[in-house]
Design a protein with these regions (language model features):
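Active-site neighborhoods and metal-handling regions in enzymes and metal-associated proteins
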Residues: 1-258
């Protein structure tokens, strides 16, 4: 496993990429409303990314046809935008997208409620986000990868939620997916020892029901096997000798209070 340690210059470029991606997510969130099609979300996302002189990293990646994955309700990840798919009041919508800035990448996902949503749905969104931060606390040089993975999964499972096994986080740099894989559940091994300068995408994918998944006929969309709601929260992070740095959070994002 070749896990790259980034230089200070490379980290700064990833930091800039993350700042841009955070702005894209903020603008997408502000635009979400009932009646939008998921294709409209994709077109806006691509326009925003290119407006910051970045490249949409998802577009064309392994044949993926859009700049953002838009996953609704029981869709966990990789929902393909469509002019036929309309988001409705009460839906929860996960937006997963990434940018390339001067050859360096950032990747982040958010799940939002559309209008008024159920308490069950809001609790799911909250626990998914909180499980990310439970894992982040262990993202320090000298710890092992499984310290992060176990903390994410334990947080969600202790609260009665399903933790998806078939999809995982990853390293990130000049490639969207680099070593190591970062599961959202406790492994039976320690995993690599974390070093300052490593960059990872932590992305809990949590369900109200089973952790088992179905793969869609389109070759991309992944749904919960039991039709239960799913949520997704992701950030690109930097391992340091002290506290980890979240590279894809806006300066005024309320999640910075964690």
């Amino acid at each position: 496993m070749a896990v790259t340690v980034k230089s200070e210059h490379e980290i700064q470029l990833m930091r800039e990429a993350g700042e841009i991606l955070a702005k894209v997510h903020e603008e997408l969130h502000a635009a979400l409303k009932p009646g939008m099609t998921t294709l409209e979300i994709d077109r806006l996302c691509e326009k925003l990314i290119r407006g910051y002189d970045c490249i949409p990293s998802f577009l064309g990646y392994e044949g993926y046809p859009a700049s953002v994955c838009v996953s609704v309700n029981d869709e966990i990840v990789h929902g393909i935008p469509s002019k036929k798919r309309v988001i409705r009041e009460g839906d929860i919508v996960s937006l997963d997208t990434g940018v390339i800035w001067k050859s360096w990448q950032s990747d982040a996902a958010r799940t939002w409620g559309i209008g008024e949503i159920s308490k069950e749905a809001q609790d799911l969104i909250d626990v998914t986000r909180e499980s990310f931060f439970a894992g982040l606390r262990f993202a320090k040089a000298g710890n092992h990868l499984n310290d992060i993975c176990g903390a994410i999964g334990d947080y969600a499972e202790e609260r009665g939620y399903g933790v998806v096994r078939d999809l995982v986080g990853h390293g990130i740099g000049t490639e969207m997916h680099e070593d190591p894989e970062v599961p959202n559940f406790r492994m039976n091994r320690k995993g690599i020892r974390l070093q300052a300068g490593m960059t990872l995408a932590l992305e809990p994918m949590i369900t109200i029901g089973t952790y088992e998944v179905d793969w869609g006929d389109d070759g991309w969309t992944v749904t919960t096997a039991d039709g239960s709601l799913a949520a997704h929260y992701e950030n690109t992070i930097l391992i340091t000798d002290g506290e980890p740095e979240i590279l894809s959070l806006g300066k005024n994002d309320p999640d910075r209070v964690h």
